[in-house]
Amino acid sequence: MHKIVYLPLAESDLMDALGYIAYTLDAPKAARDLLAEFDETVQRIAEFPYAHELYRTDRPMKDEIRKVPVKNYVLYYAVFPDRVEIRRFLYGKRQRQDL
């Protein structure tokens, strides 16, 4: 099983999403459900890091990025021999040039 490392930007993305859903949309149960599915997805990634599709872009990227949907969001991560880095957690309809 790979060690999971959360980059600060990914942690911020997750907190922003949960806060928006819980407080702006006044849907705390939906926020809890999203967090539960996020946690389950990360556990699956730790066990099977290559199971999800590669993120394709025309721009050159230093690391190979993979993506997996989590409800209306997309989790982006990179796999290394000793760890998986959770890079971003973005709303599914958001533009991707900021990866």
Give names to the regions the model predicted:
Residues 1-37:
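Arg/Lys-rich, positively charged N-terminal/basic patches that mediate binding to nucleic acids
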Residues 22-25, 46, 50-53, 94:
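Secondary-structure transition/hinge residues
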Residues 25, 63-66, 70-99:
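Enriched for short, Lys/Arg-rich terminal
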Residues 43-69:
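A short, surface-exposed loop/turn module that caps and links secondary-structure elements
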